[in-house]
Amino acid sequence: MSSMAGDLGFIGVSTQHSLIQKLFPLWVDVLGLGEAKLRGFDHPPGVSLADMRLQVEQLRGDSSLAGALVTTHKVVVWECAKGLFSESDSHAQRLHEVSCISRNSEGELVAHAKDPLTARWAINQIVSPEHWQRFPEAEVLILGAGGAGLALAWVLLDSNEKPARIHLTEVEAGRGSQVRDHLKEFSQELWSLHEINSPEEADLILAKLPPQSLIVNASGLGKDRPGSPLSTSADFPSECHIWEFNYRGSLEFLHQALRQQRKQRLHIHDGWEYFLAGWAYIIAEVYHFELTEPLFAKLREAALPLRPIH
C-alpha cells in the first residue's frame, strides 16, 4: 500500500482516550500504510446538526484525510450530511446512519454503515450458523436495541439459519417505533421487542430462554456507564452463549456471567474481537484493500499486547 495513503479521521466524543490511539500505529506497520496517522475530532453527545455538517464539510475539503470512522454520532452524520456524500451503501440508507466515510476514485465522499458487516463476522466467531440447526429451540436475547444491537438482530433475521426467536429489549421511551421500522421486513413470528423499565423485567425474559441460547449485552452498560442490563439476581440458563459487546470498562454483565460460568456451563465472549473487526473493516474500506482472514489474523496478533485482562 502507498506511503501516501492519507490519514484516518476519527469522529467521536473523547477520541484521545480510545485504545485505537495505541493500536492504529501498530496496524499501520502491518498494513504498510506509511506515514498514516489517526486524527481525532471530538464532539459532545447532542452535537448540533450544523456543527456536525461543518465537520463533514471540513473532512471533504481536506485531501490529506483518506476517510473517517464515526462512533457516537453515526445518526447525526447521516441526518446532517447525507447530501454531502456522492454515494451511500445500502446499509447506510436502511439504517440512516454512517459509521465509515471513504473516498471514491474521484475523491468524493462515500457513506457506509459497517455495523451489519461487523456483526455478521463476529456472530460467526461465537456461534456457527449450524448452531441453530443443532439446537432448533435456542433463542437470542439482545439487551439493548440501539444501533449495534439492531444490526445484530437484522443479521440474524437475514440469515438462512435462524434462531427460534430473537428478543430485543429497549428502555428508551419512544424508540420502539424505530426498531419496528428497521425490522419490518421480517415476520414478527421471528422476533419480539420488549419495552421494559427495569433490569428485573429483563431477568424474566432471560429466565424463559432454552439452553444453548445466545445472550448479548448491547446496552452500553458496563463501558462508559457502570451497571448491567440484568439485576444482580439474574440466573443465566444452562449452556448458553454469553456475549458482552464491551471489552473495557466496569463490565458488570461479563462478571455476572463469569461467576456462573462453571455452574451453568456457560460459553463467554467479550467484545475484544468485535472491537478489532469493527476498526479493521472500516480501515479496509477507507484504504481500499480486502480484509482476508489471514490478514485479520496478523492484525489480531499485533493487537494482542494491548488486550485488557479481565
Segments from the language model and where they lie:
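Short, conserved loop/helix-junction motifs that constitute active-site signature segments
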Residues: 2-3, 134-136, 159-161, 208-210, ...
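Short beta-strand element of Class I
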Residues: 38, 163-167, 240
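Rossmann-like NAD(P)-binding element
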Residues: 60, 175, 199-230
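Rossmann-fold NAD(P)-binding glycine/threonine-rich loop
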Residues: 100-103, 222-295
